[in-house]
Amino acid sequence: MVNITDKSKCCGCNACGDVCIHQAIKFHIDVEGFWYPEVDKDKCTDCGLCEKVCPIINTEDWHESGGFEKPHCYALINKNIEVRFDSTSGGAFSALADEIYKKSGYVGGAIYNEDWSVSQFLSSSREDLSRLRSSKYLQSHLDGFYIAVREALKTGKPVLVCGSPCQMAAMKRFLRKPYENLMVVDYICRGIASPLYFKQFINYLEQKHHSTVVYYKAKSKELGWRTLSTRVEFANKDVDYILGKENPWLSMQYKIPEVCRPSCFDCPFKGFPRTSDLTIGDLWSSPGSIPKELDSDIGTSVVFANNEKGADMLNKCKKKIIWSDFSFEEATKGNYHLMYSLKHSEHNREDFFKTLNISFQACIDKYMPDFGQTQKSLKEKIKNVACFIKGVTGAAGWNIGTWIKNMRYNLFCRQIETDILERKFIIINKYCTLDLHPKAKLVLNAPFIMGYKRIKGSKLESRLLIEENGRMEIKYGSYTVYYGADIQVFKGAHLEIGGDASVNVGLNLICANHISIGRWTGGGRNVTIRDNNGEHHISIRGYKTSIPIVIKEHVWLTENCTIMPGTTIEAGAIISARSVVQGHVPSFSIVSGDPAKVIETKVYWLSLIHISEPTRR
C-alpha cells in the first residue's frame, strides 16, 4: 500500500485513489493546500495496485517507447483570432481539441470550479472548450478522471487528455496498455502552485474590490502577451488589469518557489523523452527568433511532437493553424523549466505557509514589504535623468526658448509636482502654451509629453489651461498628447489620467467638474471629452450644466468621437469613429452612432498604446 512519509515523493496525481476498487484511499489536504493519500487499513487488501500506478515509484519505465530521439519542434498559432485571444499562448490546445470534437470524441483538461479550485474534466461537447482552454496555474483534482478516461476509450472514439507531465505519466500507468485512440498532451510545467495560495489571492482581490470574483484570466492578451497581464472581473462590474511586474501573486511565486508542491523540486518528468505524444507551452525565445507571421504579441505556442502519433495529430490540424519549424535548442533555452526542476529559495517553507494561512496580504507585508513602491536605485535615477534630457532634446532641438520652458516648468514651477530622478516630469514641445493659475496644480507620477509632433516642422499649437484650485494628475504611466490639443481644467475641477497611453492629434478635453480616465486608455484624432455644457441652461427636468465623466481602464476612443457629460465607459470598451456617447457603455463592447448604441459585445482587443515612453516618440 502507499504510505507517504516523505511528501516530496508524492505528486498528488490522485491515480492511486482511482485505481483502488475497494475505495480504501482518501485524500487529506494539509496546511499547504496540497492533498496526499491516506489508506483505510480496514478496507485495504494490500493488492499493490496503488503502488503499481504511482508514477513516482515507477519512474524507471514511464517514458514513451518508440518516440523520436529528438522531438520535432514547431512555432504555432491558431488561425481563429478569438481562440488565440482566449488562449494562454497561441491556441494549440484548442486546435487539437477541435479535431477530436469533430470526430465526436472526448477532450480532457482542467477547469475552474465555482470556488476557484481546479478539477480535471472530460468533455464530449465543444461548448466546454472555453472552460478547458487556458492554463490555471494551480494543482487540479483528478478524482474519477482516470476512470472516466478509461471508459471513454472503451467506446472506440478518439480521446485527448491534457495535463501536467506527472499527471499524464500517471494516466499511462493507470491505463496499463497503449490505446490507439488516445492522444496524450502535457504542458511545459515550472512547478504546480498550491490551491491554498490561489484561494488566498482570490480573497485578497475580493477584499480589495469589495466584491466577489466572477471571472479570472491568468494570462490576458489585451495589454500584450509579453506583459503577462491578468484580467479579473468582479460582481460589482469592476475590471482589474494587473501587469505581470505589478502582480503580487506572480512576483511572490518567483521570489518564493516554495508555493509549489514539494515534489516539484526534484521532478523526474523534466526533459526528454516524454511520456506524452505532444508537449505544448509558451514560445519564449530570443527577440526576432519567432517568424513575424506568428508573432503579433497575442501569443505563440511551442509544440513538441514527441513521436509519430503526435506528429500525425498536428498534421491533421493544419487547416486550423499556422505553423513553422522552430529550433529545438532555441525553444528549450527559452523554457528553462522544460528541462530543469525548481530550486529552493532561502525562505522557510513552514513559516511561509503559516503566514499564508493568515492572509495573502500578510505574505506581501512579510516577504515583499517594498512591493508596489517606486523607490529608484541610483542606476535607475541616472537613467531617468538621461530619459528626461533625451525627451527634451527631441522636443526642443536647438530651440533655446523651448529648452528654457522645459527647465522652468520642471525645476522652478510651484504649480507642477515633478521629480526627474523618480521619472516624474513634463516634456513640452515647441508651440505649446501653458496657462497655470498660481493656485493650480499639475501632479505628475509619470512622464507627461505635451504637444508631440509627428511632423517636426508643424506650428500647430497645443494648449493647457488649469484655473484656480484646478487639479490635473498623471497617475501611473507615461501619457503622450499629440499636437493640436486643447486641455482645459476649470476652477476647482479635477482631471485624473491613468496614463500608459497616448492621444492623437486634436484632443479637446474640457473639465469643469471631474473627469477620470483609466490606465491604458488612449484616443485617435480629434477626440472630444467634456463634462460640461458651457453653463448653458435648458428647461429639461434633471438637466445639469456639468456631470462627471468616468472612463475606465483599456478603453479605445477612436477618431472624432465625442464623450458627453455624465458618461461612464466600462473597461475594455471601444467607441467607434464619430460616435456621440452619453450614458453607460458596458465592458468589452463596441458602441457606434449618434447617439451611440451597443453593436458588439464580448469583444477583446490588443492595445499597443501602453508603450508610450517619451524617448520612443
Segments from the language model and where they lie:
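Iron-sulfur cluster-binding cysteine motifs and their immediate structural context
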Residues: 2-4, 9, 15-32, 36-38, ...
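Domain-scale signature associated with acetyltransferase and cell-envelope carbohydrate enzymes
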Residues: 380-530, 552-554, 563, 571, ...
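Short, flexible loop segments at boundaries between secondary-structure elements
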Residues: 183-204
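Gly/Ser/Thr-rich loops at beta-strand to alpha-helix junctions
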Residues: 89-91, 114, 161-171, 191-193
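Glycine-rich phosphate-binding "P-loop"
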Residues: 119-144, 541
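Short "domain-exit" segments at the C-terminal end of structured domains
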Residues: 613-617
